[in-house]
Regions:
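Conserved N-proximal alpha/beta basic substrate-recognition cap immediately N-terminal to
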Residues: 1-98, 113, 260
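Phosphate-binding site of ATP-dependent enzymes
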Residues: 132-226
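C-terminal active-site "lid" helix and adjoining low-complexity regulatory extension at the edge
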Residues: 232-272, 279-314
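Short, flexible loop/turn elements at secondary-structure junctions
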Residues: 109-111, 125, 155-157, 178-180, ...
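Protein kinase-like catalytic core scaffold
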Residues: 105, 187-189, 285-287
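Glycine-rich phosphate/pyrophosphate-binding beta-alpha loops
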Residues: 115, 173, 194-200, 290-300
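A glycine-rich, aromatic-flanked flexible loop/lid motif
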Residues: 219-239
Length: 314
């Protein structure tokens, strides 16, 4: 569509991989085909980020942040309620589900990333039988325990009314990237508003939008854009609800930043963490942390490379 020569494009992709450490996906997501050398070298690419995460974070401590099962124990003061059930806990699981009839539950695979394993189901009771979505409880258990030894789930989060108005299809979270400096202070190096587009999850890799937030004010600076930015442009308004994205002020922003700065010092050896935060009508909730946070969300919404931001703290 941009009139580029295919052969020349392929050669440039290979050259960029060797010169900048970019993957072929990076080449298109960062729109290298329309950028000169100076702009390309400003990006934190796949090769750079692999080295960066290993150097900046203590690899012996990252499980305390990344594990969905350990996370509530380390960061429980700010977390959404979570539960783990094994085959020996079937009775407890039944009682738990009975207490959730008429509500939704979020099931996750503790070892999965990018929202690939998330299932949001409604709990119902019909003729004294419990159903999870359209699936009978017995069938659900047989399916789950055939693949793993335990079930991990969380309470469904009811997001803030103003965020719900922008996109009601999923819980729209805030990604905040923190950095513990060598002087043991915490700085916020990026904040992004992740916005679902007719999707039950808001993960960037699922075709949703992300928009850059001013870390100081909590105001969205630009419209949202998809990860495959080569096929998209900025959306100042939500594609479906038509509610404004650019200029939106995230509720409870000051409280959110205080929470993140406190949480970042729980495991300070993991210096750089990408936090996922949900905003409810009563305040922020910490969902999870990621020691190998995604470079795409960090840079694509901004429209330029931010490698220099990361180099300041090595």
């Amino acid at each position: 569509n941009k009139g580029l020569n295919v052969f020349g494009l392929i050669i440039d992709m290979i050259w960029s991989s060797l010169r900048y450490g970019s993957s072929f996906v990076d080449y298109f997501n960062f729109r290298f085909y329309e950028k000169d050398h100076q702009k390309r070298r400003a990006y934190a690419t796949m090769g750079f980020m692999y080295r960066y995460h290993r150097e900046i974070n203590d690899q012996k401590k990252i499980r305390e942040v990344d594990s969905k099962e350990l996370f509530p124990h380390r960061f429980g003061a700010w977390c959404n309620k979570s539960y783990v059930f094994t085959k020996d806990d079937i009775d407890q699981f039944n009682h738990f589900l009975l207490s959730k009839v008429g509500q939704k539950i979020v099931f996750k695979d503790p070892n999965s990333t990018a929202g690939k394993s998330i299932k949001i189901v409604s709990v119902t009771k019909k003729e004294n039988l419990i159903y999870l979505g359209n699936q009978h409880l017995k069938d659900f258990l047989n399916q789950e325990f055939a693949l793993k030894h335990s079930i991990y789930c969380e309470d469904f989060i009811i997001q803030h009314n103003s965020i719900q108005a922008i996109s009601p299809s999923g819980v729209n979270t805030i990604r905040i990237i923190s950095m513990v400096t060598k002087e043991k202070t915490v700085v916020i190096i990026a904040a992004l508003f992740r916005i679902s587009v007719n999707c039950p999850i808001d993960n960037y890799s699922a075709g949703n939008l992300a928009a850059e937030i001013d870390p100081v004010t909590g105001i969205v600076l630009k419209g949202g854009i998809r990860k495959r930015s080569a096929c998209d442009d900025y959306h100042d308004f939500h594609p479906i609800t038509k509610m404004p994205i650019r200029g939106f002020e995230i509720p409870f922003w000051d409280e959110t930043i205080v929470m993140i700065k406190e949480a970042a010092m729980i495991v300070p050896e993991v210096r750089s963490i990408g936090w996922d935060v949900a905003i409810t009508n009563t305040g922020p909730i910490l969902i999870e942390g990621n020691s190998q946070w995604n470079k795409d969300t960090f840079q694509i919404p901004a429209g330029y490379g931010k490698k220099d931001v990361l180099l300041r703290y090595i």
